[in-house]
Amino acid sequence: MVMGLIGRKVGMTRIVAGDGRVLPVTVIHVAPNTVAQVKDIATDGYCAVQVATGTRRPQRVTSALAGHFRKNGIAPGRLLREFRVADTANYACGMDIDLDIFAEGQRVDVSGVSKGKGFAGAIKRHNFRSNRASHGNSLSHRAPGSIGCRQTPGRVFKGKKMAGHLGAEQVTTLNLELVRIDANRRLLMIKGAVPGARDGDVMIRPAVRG
């Protein structure tokens, strides 16, 4: 895997491309990303770069995390994320990762926490078809139907699609087009929708299937 950036979702808008097409884009603001730790095979068993973004008041940082930042000589960050890399030779603690690691027209993968929907039924959560509206149906219009068999196996299998908590989980959208980069305002404009609500944190990486 290769390096990426941590950003914050601003919202969606539309822009006019050079060929006249009107494109729906998600705007992501990328605050300065600073290398907080470099991991290699000798010490950690794998190669990765830990990145910090944003700022946090010292009194809001736990002792363990404050020691981690102090050891590596950087100011406490609001958020820590890790990116796997093939080689860590080009990275050092304290260096900034800028928007120039991406280029306009490049394909990217965006990861974020999806919007939480709370407790949802099987129809909304798993896209089940609703039951018949009439003709003998009583109070089972949105019921999931049968969830098992009989005495054998005598249980409901794990993973059965049923009602439960919907959303608020890590989601990655693949192969999105990075339409425009505004370096002055530190904005990335990505075609289409990305996971999460406004002001949610997202991770942007070069596409693995691009």
From Swiss-Prot:
One of its GO terms (cellular component) is cytosolic large ribosomal subunit. GO terms for biological process: translation. The modification N5-methylglutamine is found at residue 151. One of the primary rRNA binding proteins, it binds directly near the 3'-end of the 23S rRNA, where it nucleates assembly of the 50S subunit. Belongs to the universal ribosomal protein uL3 family. NCBIfam families: L3_bact (TIGR03625). Part of the 50S ribosomal subunit. Forms a cluster with proteins L14 and L19. This is Large ribosomal subunit protein uL3. It comes from Acidithiobacillus ferrooxidans (strain ATCC 23270 / DSM 14882 / CIP 104768 / NCIMB 8455) (Ferrobacillus ferrooxidans (strain ATCC 23270)).
